[in-house]
C-alpha cells in the first residue's frame, strides 16, 4: 500500500468514526457547541488507533493509547470550554468499542448452548470474549488515567 492510499484510508477511517461520535453525543444531549469537538476527538482517537495498528501494534494496545490521547485532549478542552471532560470523551471513544468481537463471542455462546460443546466453538468464544474484554478495559483505563495524572494534588515524586 502506498503512502497516498494509506493517507486516504486513514482519512476515510477518521471521517467515518466521527459520524457515530457525533450521533452518540447527540443521544447523550451534549451541547451543540461541543458537537464538532466530539467529532474531531472521535476522529483523532480512531485515527491514532488505526495508525498504531498499521504500524504493527495489536488492537488492545492501540486502543489504550488512543483512549489516553482522547482522555488527555478531553481534559484540556474541558478547561478551555468550561465543560466536563466526559462531554467530549465518552462519545469520542464509542466508535472504538469492540462490537464485532463481542458479537462473535455471543453468537459462539448461543451456538454452544444450542448445538452442544465443541472445541473450535469454545476457542472462538474465549478468544473473542477476551479480546472484547481487553479492549473495553483498555478504553476505560485509558480514559481514567489522564484524569488521575492531571488532577493529582500531591507531587509525583
UniProtKB/Swiss-Prot annotation:
Family classification: Belongs to the ThrE exporter (TC 2.A.79) family.
GO cellular component, one term: plasma membrane
Keywords associated with the record: Cell inner membrane, Cell membrane, Membrane, Transmembrane, Transmembrane helix, Transport
NCBIfam families per the UniProt record, alphabetical: PRK09917.1 (NF007391)
InterPro entries in the record: ThrE_2, ThrE_Dicarb/AminoAcid_Exp, YjjB
HAMAP family: YjjB
A Gene Ontology biological process term: succinate transport
Presence of keyword Membrane: yes
Transmembrane segments: 8-28, 34-54, 55-75, 87-107, 129-149
Membrane topology: Multi-pass membrane protein
Subunit field text: The transporter is composed of YjjB and YjjP.
Broad class of where this protein is predominantly found: membrane
Record's protein name: Probable succinate transporter subunit YjjB
General function of this protein: Involved in succinate export with YjjP. Both proteins are required for export.
Pfam families named among the record's database cross-references: ThrE_2
